[in-house]
Amino acid sequence: MKASIALIKILKSEGVDTIFALSGNQIMVLFDACLDEDIRIIHVRHEAAAVYMAEAYARMTRRIGVAMVTAGAGLCNAIAPLFTATQSQTPVLLLSGDSEVELDGKGSFQEMDQVKITCALTKYSERINETKNLIPNVLKAIKFAKDGVPGPTHLALAADILNTELAEPFTDLKQDYKSARDVEEPSARLIKAFASAERPLIIVGPFFGMPHFAEKLKELETQLNAPVVMMESPRGFNDPRLGNIKSMINLVDLVIVVGKPIDFTLSYGSVEAFNANAEWFAYI
C-alpha cells in the first residue's frame, strides 16, 4: 500500500470525513486516495480559505479540521490562518505537499524548509521524509491538535514518500489516549479558596466558545453560583458583549482561569485592573 493511501486511511479512522483543499502537484495522489476512501473534498480558490474553513468546521462539528495545500506558495498562502487557529484554540491539521527527499539541497521544484516556517505558528510541525515515520507522525499531529489546549499542527509531505510503498502491511489504527483536558480533581487549596471567596470569577478561553459548550457553561455558573466568562475577543474586557465587567473585576476576590493565557486581554492580571488581594488559580 502506498503511503498516500495509508495517510488517508488513518485520517478516516480518526473520524475525518471532509478535507478542505486547493489542488496541485505533490498532493494529487492524496486526492485519489480521498476518492477511494469516500472522504469529501471541498475545493477552494485560495489556500488560506482552506485552513479558515477547516477551523470553522472543527468549531462547529467538534472534530479536527483538515486542510490540504501544495508546496511553495501554496504553503505560504496558508500561514495566516494557522495564527488564527492558535488564538481560537481550534484543532486543525494542515497537510502540505513538499519537494522530493531524494532531491534535497539540489534546488528542486518548490523546495523550502516548511517546518522552519510553520513551527512558530503550530503546536507540532514535522516533515515526513521516511515511510516508517508516516503513521507515528500523523497520529502525533492529530493528538497534538486535540490535546490540552487545542491548536493547529502541520505535516509536510514529501512527494516521493507519498508515492512509496509501505514496508509493513497497514492496519487500521485509532488512537486511544487520555486527553490533557481530563483535568485532575481540584486541589485542596482551590477548594478552600473557593469556599471562602465572596466574589469569585471564572474565566475560560476561546476553546470553550464552541457551540456545544454554551449550555455546559451555564450549568457551571448555576452549580457554582459564580459568573463564568468566556473570553475570545482581542478586545478583552472592553468587548461590548461582556457589558460593564471592566468596572467590576477590581471587586473580585478569587480569579480562576482555565485554558487561557493571562495576557493583554486580561490586562496581564495587573493590580490596576484586578483587586490586588485577589487570589489566582490558572490552568493554562
Task: Name what the model sees in each region.
Residues M1-I284:
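N-terminal alpha/beta PP-like core and its mobile active-site loop of ThDP/TPP-dependent enzymes
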